[in-house]
């Protein structure tokens, strides 16, 4: 594990008036590829502490969809993403783990906020089960505590975001999980685009900020949908909540 800290961050100058910009969290991000790398950048700009897992290294093909630079090709994705956020002016605390995530990686951690950007349904399911078990086992819950599980799924021009903030969301989300064998593999030259990954990541961070703001205000006026579907071919973004 490696980390980086510089407490003199000035990356929030233009938005520090928002309440969410001054409520920094520990965020656990599984994956540093398509959406994971962009989400890590956007959350680092705010100043959150990032915990980022990925065993793979950036390759030339990743330049077409992921937040990486030619100078970090061949470097582990988690460590490279941290380095790339530094190149873009971020100096938040950023922990990296150059291994595939498994349950032991969350041991003894306050894993309240988990964002799954894994390319494996198996890891998505296991990460969710760990997060759910951790949440349900709590006996003394802090009213100001943030409890969020986010799952991102993406193709070259479409994307889905599942944002779980209630026990009802947990039950609904379980029905969306399937095995890796059931997943449909897209052709190599139709798998990912930079603008789709960055747009999806932007929506994730916007909803994350809304949830933080609602929690701080004590009332829920900003939208935090359970499911968001994005299609760049039809230019549609459709949201639905557990009550729809």
What are these regions (language model features)?
Residues 89-95, 145:
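A short helix-to-beta-strand connector/capping loop
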Residues 97-105:
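Conserved SAM/SAH-binding loop
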Residues 30-31, 53, 97, 116-119, ...:
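Short His-Asn-centered micro-motif
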Residues 18-20, 68:
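Glycine-rich phosphate/ribose-binding loops and adjacent secondary-structure elements
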Residues 1-15:
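S-adenosyl-L-methionine
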Residues 25-47, 51-59:
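Glycine-rich adenosine-cofactor-binding loop
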Residues 52-90:
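Glycine-rich phosphate-binding loop and adjoining beta1-alpha1-beta2 segment
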Residues 2-5, 21-24, 109-244:
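Glycine-rich phosphate/adenylate-binding loop
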């Amino acid at each position: 594990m490696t980390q980086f800290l510089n407490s003199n961050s000035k990356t929030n100058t233009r938005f520090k008036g928002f309440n969410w910009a001054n409520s920094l969290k520990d965020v656990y991000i599984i994956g540093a590829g398509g959406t994971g790398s962009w989400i890590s950048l956007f959350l680092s700009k705010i100043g959150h502490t990032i915990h980022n897992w990925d065993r793979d290294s950036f390759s030339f093909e990743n330049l077409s969809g992921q937040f990486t630079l030619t100078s970090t090709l061949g470097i582990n994705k988690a460590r490279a993403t941290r380095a790339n956020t530094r190149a873009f002016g971020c100096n938040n605390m950023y922990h990296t783990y150059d291994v595939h995530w498994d349950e032991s990686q969350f041991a003894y951690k306050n894993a309240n906020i988990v964002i799954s950007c894994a390319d494996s349904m198996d890891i998505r399911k296991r990460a969710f089960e760990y997060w759910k078990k951790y949440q349900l086992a709590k006996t003394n819950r802090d009213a100001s505590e943030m409890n969020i599980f986010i799952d991102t799924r993406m193709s070259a021009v479409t994307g889905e975001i599942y944002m779980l903030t209630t026990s009802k969301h947990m039950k609904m989300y379980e029905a969306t999980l399937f095995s890796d064998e059931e997943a449909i593999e897209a052709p190599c030259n139709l798998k990912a685009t930079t603008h789709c990954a960055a747009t999806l990541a932007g929506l994730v961070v916007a909803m994350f900020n809304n949830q933080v703001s609602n929690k701080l205000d004590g009332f829920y006026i900003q939208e935090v949908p359970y499911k968001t579907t994005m299609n760049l071919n039809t230019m549609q973004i459709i949201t639905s909540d557990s009550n729809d």
